C-alpha cells in the first residue's frame, strides 16, 4: 500500500460515522502485530516514542530526526496507517513546517501539532500553552509544509486541562478556520465537556484519552469522535515482559523454563518469514 493510500485510509476513518480505537505502535514489531490483529490505524505517541527510542519520560527530549527515523522503520515494516504525535513540531512555526515534511517523507498517514509550550520553561511547574497567535502560525506552517494533500494534519490543544474548556473551544474554532483536517483534544474528563466541544465545532474529533465511563464508542461516535486513544499499554506490557524475562534468567531459570515466550508460529509471522523465504528462493536460488 502506497503512502497516499494509507493517508486516504485515515481520511476514510475521519469521514465515517463511527469511532475506532487505534493500536499503540512504536517499532517494527508492534506495528506488524497491530496490523495482523486487524487494527484500522496505528498511533505513534510521543511518550511511547520517547521510551522506545531514548528510554526517557515524555519531556520533549526526542528530536525530529529520531522520531522520523522510527516512523520510517515502521512504514517499511507494515502498511498500517499511522497517526503520529508530532508534539510541538520541535520548535517554532518554521520548525513545524520541516517536521511535516520529514514525517510525510517517512510515511506517516497523519500527524498532530499541539499548542503546549515545549520544552518546559525554567520554573514552570505546570504545563503552559503558547499564545493563540503562535498556535495559528504553527498550524498554518504545518499545512504549508504538506506536499501530499492527502496527509492528515490535526490541530491539537490541551487547553481543557491547562486553561479552560472555553479556551479549548475558542482555540479549536480558530484552528478549524485555518484548514486543519480534524481536532485533537487532551484533558477531557466528562461527557459535558465533550458535548460542549462537539456542539461548538464542526470537524472530526480525536480524543487523546478519557475516563472509562467515556469509552462507549457509540456515544463517542455520536459526538463526532472518530478516533479515541486508549493509552500506550503495549509498550508498558513489553517493558514488564522484558524485565520479568531478564530477572528470571538472572535468578537461574533455564531458558526452556521461561514463561510468556511467543510461539514459533507467532515469531515467524511477525518476522514475515514466509515472505523472506520466498524472496530467498526467487532472488538467491536458496531453499526448495
UniProtKB/Swiss-Prot annotation:
Annotated Mg(2+) binding sites: 85
Stored Gene3D superfamilies: Phosphoenolpyruvate-binding domains (3.20.20.60)
Catalysed reactions, semicolon-separated: oxaloacetate + H(+) = pyruvate + CO2
CDD domains cross-referenced by the UniProt entry: ICL_PEPM
Molecular function via GO: magnesium ion binding; methylisocitrate lyase activity; oxaloacetate decarboxylase activity
Protein EC: 4.1.1.112
Lipid biosynthesis as UniProt keyword: no
Cofactor requirement: Mg(2+)
Residues involved in substrate binding: 47, 156, 232
Co-factor note (free text): Binds 1 Mg(2+) ion per subunit.
InterPro entries: ICL/PEPM, Oxaloacetate_deCOase_bac, Pyrv/PenolPyrv_kinase-like_dom, Pyrv_kinase-like_dom_sf
Domain of life assignment: Bacteria
First-level EC class: lyase
Alphabetized UniProt keyword annotations: Decarboxylase, Lyase, Magnesium, Metal-binding
Biological processes annotated in GO: oxaloacetate metabolic process; propionate catabolic process, 2-methylcitrate cycle; pyruvate biosynthetic process
Keyword check for Magnesium: yes
Chain's role: Catalyzes the decarboxylation of oxaloacetate into pyruvate. Seems to play a role in maintaining cellular concentrations of bicarbonate and pyruvate.
Family indicated by similarity: Belongs to the isocitrate lyase/PEP mutase superfamily. Oxaloacetate decarboxylase family.
Subunit and interaction comment: Homotetramer; dimer of dimers.
Full protein name: Oxaloacetate decarboxylase
Organism: Bradyrhizobium sp. (strain ORS 278)
Amino acid at each position: 500500500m502506497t503512502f497516499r493510500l494509507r493517508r486516504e485510509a485515515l481520511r476514510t476513518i475521519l469521514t465515517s460515522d463511527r469511532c475506532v480505537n487505534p493500536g499503540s505502535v512504536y517499532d517494527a514489531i508492534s506495528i506488524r502485530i497491530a496490523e495482523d490483529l486487524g487494527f484500522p490505524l496505528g498511533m505513534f505517541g510521543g511518550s511511547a516514542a520517547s521510551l522506545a527510542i531514548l528510554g526517557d519520560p515524555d519531556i520533549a527530549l526526542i528530536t525530529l530526526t529520531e522520531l522520523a527515523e522510527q516512523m520510517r522503520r515502521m512504514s517499511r515494516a507494515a502498511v498500517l496507517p499511522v497517526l503520529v504525535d508530532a508534539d510541538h513540531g520541535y520548535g517554532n512555526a518554521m520548525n513545524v513546517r520541516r517536521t511535516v515534511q520529514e514525517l510525510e517523507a517517512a510515511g506517516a498517514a497523519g500527524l498532530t501539532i499541539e499548542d503546549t509550550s515545549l520544552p518546559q520553561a525554567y520554573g514552570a511547574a505546570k504545563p503552559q500553552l503558547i499564545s493563540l497567535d503562535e498556535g495559528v502560525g504553527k498550524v498554518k506552517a504545518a499545512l504549508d509544509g504538506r506536499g501530499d494533500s492527502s496527509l492528515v494534519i490535526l490541530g491539537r490543544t490541551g487547553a481543557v486541562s491547562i486553561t479552560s474548556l472555553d479556551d479549548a473551544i475558542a482555540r479549536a474554532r480558530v484552528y478549524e478556520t485555518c484548514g486543519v483536517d480534524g481536532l485533537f483534544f487532551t484533558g477531557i474528563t466528562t461527557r459535558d465537556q465533550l458535548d460542549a466541544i462537539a456542539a461548538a465545532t464542526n470537524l472530526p474529533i480525536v480524543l487523546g484519552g478519557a475516563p472509562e465511563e467515556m469509552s462507549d464508542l457509540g456515544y463517542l461516535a455520536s459526538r463526532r469522535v472518530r478516533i479515541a486513544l486508549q493509552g500506550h499499554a503495549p509498550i508498558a506490557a513489553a517493558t514488564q515482559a522484558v524485565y520479568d524475562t531478564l530477572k528470571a534468567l538472572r535468578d537461574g531459570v533455564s531458558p526452556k523454563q521461561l514463561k510468556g515466550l511467543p510461539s514459533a508460529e507467532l515469531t515467524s509471522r511477525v518476522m514475515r518469514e514466509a515472505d523472506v523465504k520466498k524472496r530467498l528462493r526467487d532472488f538467491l536460488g536458496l531453499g526448495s
